[in-house]
Amino acid sequence: MAKQDYYEILGVSKTAEEREIKKAYKRLAMKYHPDRNQGDKEAEAKFKEIKEAYEVLTDSQKRAAYDQYGHAAFEQGGMGGGGFGGGADFSDIFGDVFGDIFGGGRGRQRAARGADLRYNMELTLEEAVRGVTKEIRIPTLEECDVCHGSGAKPGTQPQTCPTCHGSGQVQMRQGFFAVQQTCPHCQGRGTLIKDPCNKCHGHGRVERSKTLSVKIPAGVDTGDRIRLAGEGEAGEHGAPAGDLYVQVQVKQHPIFEREGNNLYCEVPINFAMAALGGEIEVPTLDGRVKLKVPGETQTGKLFRMRGKGVKSVRGGAQGDLLCRVVVETPVGLNEKQKQLLQELQESFGGPTGEHNSPRSKSFFDGVKKFFDDLTR
């Protein structure tokens, strides 16, 4: 029975470049791999064909011979009749694909980078707006100062793992397929510590608390995060340290509310000032300032004081302070005050005075119309 053309087996043209051949091989090998088709003889035979075609077409000398003579170039035993031996570089083809599937992966496992740490910092609004420097104390893992992170007793060195010979990987055969797995002896590090450090017991790190000075820039707000590079936990066996992230939480203020770079506050005034107008003092983060209140001011009126808010943490313009007026109803009136208010109300023409209380008139006119419509 005539053998199928190698190019046809891989589904590539005769002018295909090596990267196209590798791509086609990877796709087909994954599809017909024996571990994915256990007990399927056809898939097993197909996989052998794919492997054989790949070995020929990725070897420049064998490919040239095949292009000139076809399968006859290898009929005298040049290919050795199939099987899984030969020169196919499976670590190159499957290192990233099958590494996760079969627990392998290429190369020695790198020592793990230190873990990142998080510190929640609570600030007052004044501290957040102006900026502040604070000292914090955090528990962490630091590099052992005796072995300097190696884990080995001073005067000794980590030894090359005899199982994987320093590669961190061991090769396992599963049917027709050879896969690499993390060395169980050294856990992928490629080295073993025969004489561990007495202080860190071979870990290369020790538990310790450290104090840091953290500069908080002006303008930060709840949810902002400040990164201190390299201030997290020390890495394993000399690997880089992680980072420390300071998470900002701004306390609720008794007077001001913050929205972005603007501040809001409520300013209570009595109804006489609301009607006649006047001048009051309002608080800001820099002290008290005077605010002119025009006559006939209603509850909810906003007065904007430009530049009295928060400076952006990213630079640029400063926010504003917005004062919301709340007109207070007087309480604890004496008889004389009640009499004066009664006279004032009568001068308005009653509770729905049309001229002096236009909103009241509009409201009661609407109520009257509503009930009139119901009775029709």
Curated annotation (Swiss-Prot):
Q: Keyword check for Ribosomal protein, yes or no.
A: no
- Provide the cofactor note recorded for this chain's UniProt entry: Binds 2 Zn(2+) ions per monomer.
Instruction: Write out the ranges of the repeats annotated as CXXCXGXG motif.
Output: 144-151, 161-168, 183-190, 197-204
Positions of the zinc fingers (CR-type)?
131-209
Induction per UniProt is:
By heat shock.
| GO BP terms, alphabetized | chaperone cofactor-dependent protein refolding; DNA replication; protein refolding; response to heat
| Record-linked SMART domains | DnaJ (SM00271)
Write out the GO MF terms. ATP binding; heat shock protein binding; unfolded protein binding; zinc ion binding
Q: Which Gene3D superfamilies match?
A: DnaJ domain (1.10.287.110), Heat shock protein DnaJ, cysteine-rich domain (2.10.230.10), Urease metallochaperone UreE, N-terminal domain (2.60.260.20)
Q: What is its main location?
A: cytoplasm
Alphabetical GO CC annotations of the entry are: cytoplasm
Residues annotated for Zn(2+) 2 binding in this entry: 161, 164, 183, 186
Q: Could you tell me which residue ranges the J domain spans? A: 5-70
Cell compartment(s), UniProt: Cytoplasm
Q: What Pfam family does this protein match (any one)?
A: DnaJ_CXXCXGXG
The record's comment on protein family reads: Belongs to the DnaJ family.
Domains (record comment): The J domain is necessary and sufficient to stimulate DnaK ATPase activity. Zinc center 1 plays an important role in the autonomous, DnaK-independent chaperone activity of DnaJ. Zinc center 2 is essential for interaction with DnaK and for DnaJ activity.
NCBIfam families, alphabetized: DnaJ_bact, PRK10767.1
Q: What does this protein do?
A: Participates actively in the response to hyperosmotic and heat shock by preventing the aggregation of stress-denatured proteins and by disaggregating proteins, also in an autonomous, DnaK-independent fashion. Unfolded proteins bind initially to DnaJ; upon interaction with the DnaJ-bound protein, DnaK hydrolyzes its bound ATP, resulting in the formation of a stable complex. GrpE releases ADP from DnaK; ATP binding to DnaK triggers the release of the substrate protein, thus completing the reaction cycle.
Its assembly, as annotated, is:
Homodimer.
Q: What is this protein called?
A: Chaperone protein DnaJ
* Species of the source: Escherichia coli O6:H1 (strain CFT073 / ATCC 700928 / UPEC)
Q: Which gene encodes it?
A: dnaJ
